[in-house]
Design a protein with these regions (language model features):
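Cysteine-centered motifs
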Residues: 19, 34, 63-66
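Low-complexity, intrinsically disordered tandem-repeat tracts enriched in small/polar residues
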Residues: 23, 38-40, 53
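Residue-level recognition of single "structural anchor" positions
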Residues: 42-45, 51-477
Length: 477
C-alpha cells in the first residue's frame, strides 16, 4: 500500500519540473513581451505673470459716513483766554486742573487747567465737592458730566457694577450679585457707554501706526420679544438677528482702534473704515491687513484714493476719463481662507494694493508674514469680556444699541485699564513689596501706554470720573 508521503513528493517533483520548463521556454528578451512604458512628457513650466495693475474707477465710491457724520473733534469757538495764576492767599489744597466750566456763557468754558476753578466746600454735607468758576462766578458739582452725577447710591457700587460688566458678566447676573434691579444696571451701562465713547474720541486721534488689522466677529442678537408678534414681524426680526462685530487694532501695541456692530455689507465696511481713518493721523497710511471680504477693498480705496489722469494711448481721439486710484503709499493685503464642510482647507495671501516687497517691509517691525493672527486672538478676548457676543450664552442683546453699549465699555477698559502681559517692561531696579513676597521686577503697561497716549494704568473709577472737554486742548495740557 502506497503512503500519502509518496504522493506529496511526486507532486513536488512535478511542480519543480514545470518551473524549469517554463524558464527554458520563456524568451530571455523581456522587452519583446513587456514593452517599456513610454515616458510621460515633462510638465510645461507655468509662465510667471505679473499682476495686472489696478486700472481705477471712473467714479468715486460713495461713503455716507464721510458725507453726513459730524466732526468727531469739534474746534473751539474762540481763542483760549489768558490763564489765571493765583498770586495771593494760601496754596490751594484741591487739584481742579482736570475740570472745566460747563457754563456756555463763560469765557473759560471748555478749557482744562486754566486756573479759573477752585473748590468751594461740600454742599449739604455731601460726598462730592462744589467748584466755583472765578470768571463767570458759577457753581457746579465736580461730578457734573459723569455717571455719578445725581446718584443717591455710593460711587463704589457703581464702579463695581461697571467693572463686572467689563469683565463679561451679564446684566441680570450683575444685578443678582449686587442685589439691584436689572433696569438700574442697564441704565448705568447706557450712561457709562455715552461717557466712554467721548473718552475714546478725546484720546484716540492723530495716531501714527505701522500696521492695522481689521476683522469681523460673528454675533447673534436675541429675537425674543415680550408679547404676541405677527408672523411677518417675527420673520423680519429673525432675518436681522445675525450681526457682525467689526474690530480694528494695532498689532504692535494691541491698541483697539474701533468696535462697531452691523451687517457684512459695503455700506457697513465704508462706515467702519471711516471710523478707523478718523483715529489715524492725516498723513498716516499704515499697512492694512484684513480677511478675504472683497468689499473691504472698495472701502479702503474710498478713503485712500485720488483722481489720476491716464496717459493717452493714441495721438488722436478723446482724452481718457480720470480714474479714481489708490494713493501710492497705500498698502493693503488680504488673508483669504477657504473653508469646506466647516474645516479650513487652504490659506493664501493676496496683495491688493502695493507690492509684495513693500508689504514685507511693513511687516518687518513685527518679524512676521501676512497674517491676521493678532486680531483673531483679540476676537477671543472680546467674546470673554463682552457678554453680548459670547458663544452659546443666554446674555444676548435684543438690539444693536445694547451691543454697542457693551462694546464701548470694553473699548476703554481694554485700552486704558487692562494691563497686558505681552506689553510689560522690566524695571531697572526691583521694587520691594509688602509682606514676604518676591520683589516687583516688571512694569505693567496697557495698550494706551504702549501707544504713547498716557503714562499710567487708569483705574475704572478714574475713567468714570474724567470729564471730557468739549474740544481738543493745547499741547502740554
Amino acid at each position: 500500500m502506497v503512503s500519502d508521503l509518496f504522493f506529496y513528493q511526486l507532486g513536488l517533483i512535478v511542480l519543480v519540473w514545470l518551473c524549469l520548463m517554463l524558464q527554458w521556454v520563456w524568451p530571455s528578451d523581456s522587452a519583446a513581451v513587456c514593452p517599456t512604458t513610454p515616458e510621460l512628457p515633462s510638465p510645461v513650466p507655468k509662465r510667471h505673470r505679473e499682476p495686472t495693475p489696478f486700472a481705477g474707477l471712473t467714479t468715486k465710491p460713495p461713503c455716507d459716513a464721510c458725507e453726513h457724520s459730524p466732526d468727531p473733534r469739534p474746534q473751539p469757538l474762540s481763542a483760549p483766554p489768558p490763564r489765571i495764576v493765583p498770586t495771593r492767599g494760601r496754596r490751594r489744597q484741591v487739584d481742579t486742573s482736570m475740570h472745566v466750566c460747563p457754563n456756555p456763557d463763560c469765557a473759560s468754558r471748555g478749557w482744562v487747567g486754566w486756573g479759573n476753578l477752585r473748590a468751594n466746600g461740600h454742599p449739604n454735607g455731601g460726598h462730592w465737592r462744589q467748584l466755583l468758576c472765578l470768571v463767570c462766578h458759577g457753581y457746579f458739582l465736580e461730578t457734573l458730566g459723569t455717571i455719578f452725577h445725581g446718584k443717591c447710591v455710593s460711587d463704589d457700587l457703581i464702579v463695581r457694577v461697571i467693572a463686572c460688566l467689563a469683565e463679561g458678566l451679564g446684566i441680570r447676573g450683575t444685578a443678582r450679585v449686587f442685589e439691584v434691579d436689572p433696569n438700574t444696571v442697564l441704565q448705568w451701562l447706557v450712561e457709562a457707554a455715552d461717557q466712554l465713547r467721548a473718552f475714546s474720541t478725546y484720546f484716540l486721534h492723530d495716531l501714527h501706526l505701522h500696521q492695522v488689522q481689521l476683522d469681523e466677529l460673528y454675533a447673534v442678537l436675541s429675537a425674543v420679544k415680550d408679547g404676541t408678534v405677527s408672523e411677518a414681524e417675527a420673520i423680519e426680526r429673525l432675518e436681522r438677528s445675525p450681526r457682525w462685530v467689526w474690530v480694528a487694532m494695532d498689532p504692535e501695541s494691541t491698541l483697539l482702534l474701533g468696535l462697531d456692530v452691523g451687517d457684512r455689507t459695503l455700506a457697513m465696511a465704508q462706515c467702519f473704515v471711516h471710523q478707523v481713518v478718523q483715529v489715524l493721523a492725516p498723513d498716516c497710511a499704515p499697512l492694512f491687513l484684513t480677511d478675504g471680504f472683497r468689499e473691504s477693498m472698495t472701502a479702503w480705496l474710498t478713503h485712500y484714493g485720488q483722481w489720476v489722469q491716464p496717459e493717452r494711448r493714441q495721438a488722436h481721439g478723446p482724452a481718457p476719463q480720470p480714474r479714481w486710484r489708490p494713493v501710492p503709499q497705500l498698502l493693503y493685503a488680504q488673508v483669504v481662507k477657504t473653508v469646506r464642510r466647516r474645516r479650513l482647507v487652504r490659506v493664501h495671501h493676496r496683495v491688493v494694493f502695493g507690492t509684495l516687497e513693500t508689504v514685507n517691509a511693513g511687516l518687518a517691525p513685527l518679524g512676521c508674514q501676512i497674517n491676521t493672527a493678532f486680531i483673531e486672538r483679540l476676537n477671543l478676548t472680546i467674546r470673554q469680556h463682552v457678554a453680548a457676543v459670547g458663544r452659546r450664552v443666554s446674555t444676548l442683546c435684543k438690539h444693536e444699541a445694547g451691543g454697542r453699549q457693551q462694546l464701548a465699555l470694553y473699548h476703554v477698559y481694554h485700552n486704558f485699564c487692562l494691563p497686558h502681559a505681552s506689553l510689560r517692561q522690566p524695571l531697572s531696579q526691583p521694587l520691594p513689596t509688602q509682606g514676604h513676597g518676591s520683589a516687583k521686577t516688571w512694569q505693567p503697561r496697557t495698550p494706551a501706554m504702549a501707544a504713547g497716549l498716557t503714562d499710567r494704568v487708569w483705574t475704572l473709577r478714574e475713567v468714570l470720573l474724567f470729564r471730557v472737554p468739549p474740544w481738543p486742548q493745547p499741547a502740554g495740557v
